[in-house]
Amino acid sequence: MSPFAHLLALPVRAYRLVASPWVGHGCRFQPTCSAYALEALERHGAAKGGWLAARRVCRCHPWGGHGFDPVPGSEAPRQD
């Protein structure tokens, strides 16, 4: 992960450590939005990963989608 991606991951890690236990597990998606953000930053770097994480958080509301929503490019290889 790039240094800037590490910097962007700090608020996400702080949220998971401090706020998440108080808020509860109310994320509509799997993986959770914070796990998605960390994986997106790790896999795609600061710019694209930050953009993917921001888009995901904007979709996480009562009228948004739900269910399994993996980070693009993280699909498991198919076994034929």
From Swiss-Prot:
SMART domains on file: Haemolytic
The organism's place on the tree of life at top rank: Bacteria
Localization annotation: Cell inner membrane
InterPro entries given in the database record: Membr_insert_effic_factor_YidD (IPR002696)
Keywords from the named record: Cell inner membrane, Cell membrane, Membrane
Keyword Cell inner membrane attached: yes
Annotated membrane topology: Peripheral membrane protein
GO CC annotation: plasma membrane
Keyword Chloroplast: no
NCBIfam families: membrane protein insertion efficiency factor YidD
HAMAP family: UPF0161_YidD
Family to which this protein belongs: Belongs to the UPF0161 family.
Function per UniProt: Could be involved in insertion of integral membrane proteins into the membrane.
Entry protein name: Putative membrane protein insertion efficiency factor
Organism per entry: Paracoccus denitrificans (strain Pd 1222)
